[in-house]
Amino acid sequence: MAVTRFGKSGAPKMKDKSGTLLIAERGGALSQNLDFWITEQGHRLKTVDNLKGLLMTLQSEKINVLVMDVRLPEDMGYEAISIIKGLDRKLPIIITADENNPEQESRIRQQGIFYYHVNSFGMDDLILAISNAMVRSSQ
């Protein structure tokens, strides 16, 4: 069972198995913001900046949680989530978006994602979602 502790970053520190977090985004801002927390948790961080790299990584490595920017899948849109689920149906997928668009959120949630994160909600919500997804993936 996971026990919540608070690390130096002030974010929850989960006592669970370490895992690998894959962040799929352009620009790398999210991975830079999460790097300290991920290291503090004992997790590994992998990053990709395109759909091809994402799919290749999922086929070749054990990934515990995927955090993907909603804009990453280029022309594939929501179909990309179905393809990812086809590779690993139990993979917790967290989608990040800059704006809260209810129609987009509804379509994405129908794909069976773990969490839909609007960036303006702040990093604490995202960190909590990643922590919960890591716990789920280790069960």
Predicted regions and their residues:
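Active-site residues of response regulator receiver
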Residues: 66-70, 97
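Acidic catalytic/metal-coordinating carboxylates
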Residues: 50, 76-79
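A short, hydrophobic beta-strand element within the central beta-sheet of small alpha/beta folds
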Residues: 90-102
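Non-catalytic signal-transmission and effector/linker regions of two-component phosphorelay proteins
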Residues: 1-37, 124-139
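Short amphipathic alpha-helix used as the core "switch/output" element in two-component signaling
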Residues: 78-89
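The feature encodes the CheY-like receiver
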Residues: 73
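Alpha4 helix (beta4-alpha4-beta5 surface) of REC/receiver domains from two-component response regulators
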Residues: 79, 99-117
